[in-house]
Amino acid sequence: MQTYLVGGAVRDRLLGLPQGDRDHLVVGATVEQMLALGFTQVGRDFPVFLHPKTQQEYALARTERKQGRGYTGFVCHASPEVTLEQDLLRRDLTVNAIAEDEEGRLHDPYGGIQDLERRVLRHVSPAFAEDPLRILRVARFAARFHAQGFVVAPETLALMREMTDAGELAHLTPERVWKELERVLLGETPQI
């Protein structure tokens, strides 16, 4: 069993920004092992647990496959055989697909560190198109990181336009749209 810090906490630390939520990824473990260690399972659709002392989130490594439209209809597969690289591949942006192991070593199979240095928001894989909520997430990140000089990669913008033209945003619920818009509006640069 190997535990990694993933997502925004790693990204923000590398940018020298305050870290928010600390999400952890667990590779090589089962639900039963996590429960035996005292974790509390909170995820319905995929195995997410709360640490018994810190209450931070720990998710088992998983892959996702889309079956349907909108941001629902994902089939998640979590098992001890899912690798770190497979889990990171399902993430939205390269800058969010960086993991830090317990020894402080960074694992960056998709070029997130280089994109941080270049100030580029780029999708990890074509699977980005499977979740239209990611369009709004990219808009939120573009607004949030505008002051640091970040731009959306041309190929990511093109993919977002294709998704919009295909009507994918129409499949989002108003609650999910509002949640993302609220995060933009409450940010430091909502006008971007």
UniProtKB/Swiss-Prot annotation:
Q: Which residues bind ATP?
A: G8, R11, R91, R137, R140
Name of the top EC class for this enzyme: transferase
Q: Which reaction does it catalyse?
A: a tRNA precursor + 2 CTP + ATP = a tRNA with a 3' CCA end + 3 diphosphate; a tRNA with a 3' CCA end + 2 CTP + ATP = a tRNA with a 3' CCACCA end + 3 diphosphate
Disulphide bonds annotated for this chain are none
Gene Ontology annotations of biological process type: RNA repair; tRNA processing
Could you state a single Gene Ontology molecular function term?
A: RNA binding
- EC number assigned by the record: 2.7.7.72
Q: Which UniProt keywords apply?
A: ATP-binding, Magnesium, Metal-binding, Nucleotide-binding, Nucleotidyltransferase, RNA repair, RNA-binding, Transferase, tRNA processing
Q: Which Pfam families match?
A: PolyA_pol (PF01743), PolyA_pol_RNAbd (PF12627)
Which SUPFAM superfamilies would you find in this protein's record?
A: Nucleotidyltransferase, Poly A polymerase C-terminal region-like
Q: Which residues does the record give as CTP binding sites?
A: G8, R11, R91, R137, R140
Give the protein family: Belongs to the tRNA nucleotidyltransferase/poly(A) polymerase family. Bacterial CCA-adding enzyme type 2 subfamily.
Subunit details: Homodimer.
What job does the chain carry out?
Catalyzes the addition and repair of the essential 3'-terminal CCA sequence in tRNAs without using a nucleic acid template. Adds these three nucleotides in the order of C, C, and A to the tRNA nucleotide-73, using CTP and ATP as substrates and producing inorganic pyrophosphate. tRNA 3'-terminal CCA addition is required both for tRNA processing and repair. Also involved in tRNA surveillance by mediating tandem CCA addition to generate a CCACCA at the 3' terminus of unstable tRNAs. While stable tRNAs receive only 3'-terminal CCA, unstable tRNAs are marked with CCACCA and rapidly degraded.
User: Know the name of this protein?
Assistant: CCA-adding enzyme
Organism source for this protein? Aeromonas hydrophila
User: Top-down, what is the taxonomic lineage of the species of origin?
Assistant: Bacteria, Pseudomonadati, Pseudomonadota, Gammaproteobacteria, Aeromonadales
Name of the gene: cca
